[in-house]
Amino acid sequence: MMKKRYGWKLLVLAALVALLAVGCSKSSKLPEGFTEESVKTQAEADIKLAESNDFEGWKARFADSLQSSITEEVYQPYLDMLAKKGDFESFGKTAFVGQEKEGQKYAAVIYVVKYAEGEIKYTVGYDEDMKLVQFVAQ
């Protein structure tokens, strides 16, 4: 019962965060001010931070407007999934998405990360200050 509740909360958080970062005006080109290299490098750092079990450090990477919705209860299912995948092996393929919405610019990378027991596909999105606005692992 407890795991279902946490899974549901994680799904709701992922949906809310995705709504903030994805909208009608999506394109594959990154907006001015973002580069593929900077987004990729920051995503790698944020994925490694999330994997490190440093909840407070990972939470601090999110935009201020999202801080209150990031809880240990939504973080734990991610750690559980990570434990099932085993040790990190390598960062794999990437795809980049950019968006401008209501005067704000966003960039995201879809990153396939290889682990000993499989892969996790991350969608990691950033605002103009390179603060996290989306972190989905599936």
Tell me the role of every PLM-derived stretch.
Residues 1-22:
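Sec-dependent bacterial lipoprotein signal peptides
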Residues 18, 52, 85-88, 129:
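Alpha-helix termination/capping residues and helix-transition junctions
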Residues 22, 89-92, 133:
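A short, local hydrophobic-aromatic micro-motif
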Residues 24-48:
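Short, low-complexity N-terminal intrinsically disordered segments enriched in polar/charged residues
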Residues 45-46, 50-57:
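Short helix-adjacent coil turns
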Residues 57-106:
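Short solvent-exposed beta->alpha transition segments
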Residues 96-138:
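Exposed beta-sheet edge and beta->alpha loop/turn motif
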